[in-house]
Amino acid sequence: MLAGVRICVVYDCLFPYTVGGGERWYRNLSERLAAEGHEVTYLTLRQWGRGERPDLDPRIRVITVGPRMGLYTASGRRRILPPLVFGLGVFLHLLRRGRRYEVVHTCAFPYFSLLAAALLQPLRRYDVAVDWFEVWSDSYWRDYLGGIGGLIGSLVQRLCARVPQRAHCFSMLHAERLRAEGLRGTVTLLRGLYAAPMESPTPRAADPVVLFAGRLIPEKQVTLAVAAVALAAERIEGLGGVFLGDGPEHTALDAAIAEHGLEDVVSAPGFASAERVDAEMRRALCMLLTSRREGYGMVVVEAAARATPSVVVAGEDNAATELLEEGVNGEIAATSDPRAIADAIIRVHEGGLAMRVSTGRWFSEHARELSLESSLETVLAGYASARA
């Protein structure tokens, strides 16, 4: 076993102070690396009170390189200033302390910290490992930041793709895009992010409930999910819905529930505990993921771990479809039309217990590659190569 690697993990957020797939990945990665005897430093922005110690394995050295800052606008988009501040903080830290590290492991987005690490790499002689959860298309950049801003964003992304690095992607979609952006070298595909126990799930009969779980931002298209549930409820007696999560689209969610007259059968309680999410996943007819943009689609794996199928909407920026085998662990709606999504929900309903059995079997067959441990082993192999 490779031991004693000095690793600097770089991410501007830390779970559970902010919640998301990237936050979970870097916390899990850091804690597993520390548990295996590696020397881990975690660079981040401060997200807790002054003088407090963050809730993290004490073997991990947490260094804040920037102050506490709001990361998102009211509409749910990333603010520009925090990534700039974080990038500068990372640059200054690595300028002073970079020689102590053998590997700097960073997320590609929001880019400036990666550029800082890449700029100092020739001087400080560490290896740079980069996780690309997503590679945005030019059209998505324009939608997100407008014409000029989108052009600048796409150019910065292209620059980041071309710096020397050991690149990791979590889907074929984004691996192919990264190569197209001009990456020099190979892309390592990491398929496993699931950190919970990998026991084979025991299927149970579903309740007539569609579950939505995620941050309520425009990309998740939560009002589209409500419309689809309303249409499916016309054909499935007693069908309801549970929408777990919070965010800037919560007001729109409540309005959509009222507009479709679903107040008695659809609930939207906001942020939920892990225990509540687990219970809802186990009983749900399906997990509904109407997102138009996903770098991975973790909720599909989490649902399958409980023998619950998923319904996912196809789209050019949605990598979650890679986790779906239609008719086995869920269904794919070909378009973002509410009727197409409702039809997919109906197909899951018609699949009955047999589809829940096949979903559990799918999870068991893919458990090894879907596990965090499999990705960790791949990452460690890359570290060993860097040390050699």
Regions found by a protein language model. Give the residues of each.
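Conserved acidic donor-binding segment of nucleotide-sugar-dependent glycosyltransferases
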Residues: 325-338, 346-353
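Aromatic "clamp/platform" in nucleotide-sugar-dependent glycosyltransferases that forms part
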Residues: 292
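Short alpha-helical donor nucleotide-sugar binding micro-motif in glycosyltransferases
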Residues: 271-272, 279-284
